[in-house]
């Protein structure tokens, strides 16, 4: 465990001349939103852009961090995700949509990601996409990523194409990007 000052020193010691951004991701950065905010401020003071990837489970914590972030990737979960308790889903999706709206309103470079598996139902995916594009549009997001799970419950190519086809009318630059960290066995 490190203090904020120790973490800032570690960042400073490890910056390379070609460092073009610092990512706050892995696990869930908003669990430590105050630390992320301080570290992001430090990074920005060096003239380096900051990037946050989050499931946005708490819009208040997200709003605390947002002023110090340049790029935001918001990860949405479908109601049939194995990682979500269905009774908590309405609150999660409410918070995630509020974070999307806040990011867009703050003119952040905003990306959307939905992780899908063989268990993801087309109807729940479609419903989520409809909710997202009641807030977002092709003019105010910079990317839409569909990320298939790797190894466990991998969706078929046909299913991925169906998901792609449901996003395409809203956003024609939709991408399907695998979980590279799992493919290369990164932690």
Regions found by a protein language model. Name each.
Residues 18-19, 30-174, 179-187:
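Conserved AdoMet/S-adenosylmethionine-binding subsite of the radical SAM
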Residues 1-22:
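Conserved alpha-helical substructure of the radical SAM core
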């Amino acid at each position: 465990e490190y203090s904020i000052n120790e973490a800032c020193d570690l960042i400073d010691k490890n910056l390379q001349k070609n460092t073009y951004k610092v990512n706050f991701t892995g696990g869930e950065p908003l669990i430590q939103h105050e630390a992320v905010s301080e570290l992001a401020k430090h990074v920005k003071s060096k003239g380096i852009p900051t990037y946050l990837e989050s499931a946005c489970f708490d819009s208040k914590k997200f709003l605390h961090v947002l002023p110090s972030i340049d790029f935001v990737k918001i990860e949405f979960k479908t109601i049939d995700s194995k990682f979500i308790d269905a009774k908590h889903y309405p609150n999660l999706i409410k918070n995630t949509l509020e974070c999307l709206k806040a990011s867009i309103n703050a003119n952040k470079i905003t990306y959307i990601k939905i992780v899908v598996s063989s268990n993801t139902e087309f109807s729940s995916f479609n419903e989520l996409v409809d909710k997202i594009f009641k807030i977002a549009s092709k003019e105010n997001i910079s990317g839409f990523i569909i990320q298939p799970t790797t190894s466990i419950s991998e969706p078929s190519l046909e299913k991925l194409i169906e998901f792609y086809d449901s996003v395409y009318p809203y956003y024609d630059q939709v991408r399907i990007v695998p979980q590279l960290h799992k493919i290369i066995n990164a932690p």
